[in-house]
Design a protein with these regions (language model features):
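Conserved, well-structured core segments that form or line functional sites
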Residues: 1-181
Length: 181
């Protein structure tokens, strides 16, 4: 595992380009290390994007320059981890949908009661995320470290029934293939 952080210029890519590039990368925080296995892209012109209708207090981090976190509460219980991408003023982000545990099993077991990290709420719980992370630069508490490129498949996103049909059907969910590591 490469233990160096990724340069901030990496996060200047748009979310659709960056989402598959994050697959296979390592996330580290507080004794827990994970491999990113599934992501979803959210772009400014995307009706599923939280910033689609404009800036609010909740989605304000999405309007920052790429390389910060956007963490929000979903269904009143799940903390969802997003990596903000692109230039300042163009709101876009990549949702981390699933991960694989590399180290810190006892910590994750205590937090979750399970080591299953398939689902964005489970990833947030494993990392003990809360709203104080939203707007924070990567590398302060949560770091993402480089890893070789992996193969992946593209699929429609999940849980966006409210979005326009074209956005619901877009192949903007990326899943690392099992043989990639």
């Amino acid at each position: 595992m490469d233990t160096t952080g990724i340069p901030t210029s990496f996060y200047e890519h748009d979310a659709l380009s960056l989402a598959p590039m994050l697959l296979g990368k390592y996330m580290n925080m507080g004794g827990v290390s994970l491999i990113i296995r599934e992501t979803e892209a959210y772009m400014p012109n995307d009706s599923a994007c939280h910033a689609y209708k404009g800036k609010t207090n909740r989605n304000a981090p999405m309007f920052a320059k790429g390389g910060i976190l956007y963490v929000y509460l979903c269904y009143g219980i799940h903390q969802m981890l997003n990596i903000v991408t692109g230039p300042q003023g163009e709101p876009q982000a990549v949702l981390i949908r699933a991960a694989e545990l590399i180290s810190g099993a006892s910590i994750v077991q205590k937090r979750r009661g399970s080591l299953d990290l398939i689902g964005p709420g489970k990833v947030g719980q494993a990392l003990a995320l809360n709203k104080t992370f939203s707007g924070e630069k990567l590398g302060v508490r949560l770091s993402i470290c480089d890893a070789p490129e992996v193969s992946y498949t593209a699929h429609p996103r999940i849980g966006i029934g409210y979005a326009q049909k074209k956005d619901r059907e877009a192949l903007w969910r990326f899943v690392m293939t099992p043989t990639s590591l």
